[in-house]
Amino acid sequence: VGYNIDSLIGEIRGILRTSGQHNIALIGAGDLGRAIASSTVFADHGFHIAGVFDSDPRKVGTQISSLSVQNPATLVETVREKNIIVGVLAVPPAAAQPAADALVEAGVKIIFSYSDALIDTPPDVTVHRSSPAAALLYALYFHLT
């Protein structure tokens, strides 16, 4: 009697395409990028950070968790080599468009941005934005009304 929960979870994951592992590229090795790379939030949902990239020469070659920060010049090769399908932007607003352009050039079709900058991409590239300030304002609005 009841539902086979394991089977149900498996079916839902299949529909949402969260079964298996999806490789992502993280652009930005500053405070936010380090926090993302050190967190299990993506891994818990089937995403593996397969590469971390930063244009700051002082950060290239440093380690975040088990990942070595790479120069963005290696992005295209890494995306193709590791079958990366998602790019995560953890960069300042001024760096968001150039970083998105590099991801698009590499063949990434999904970009998740923590930047407040509006990003222009071709129609076949999906951009999702997550702004902590906007989320806080949204929560505050509904709490106060």
Q: Which stretches of residues belong to each language-model region?
A:
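Internal alpha/beta core interface subdomains
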Residues: E105-Y114
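Short secondary-structure boundary segments
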Residues: V91, Y114-D116
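Hydrophobic, well-ordered beta-alpha structural blocks that scaffold small-molecule cofactor pockets
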Residues: V1-A106, P122-L144
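Short, glycine/polar-rich helix-capping loops at beta-to-alpha or helix-loop-helix junctions
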Residues: I119
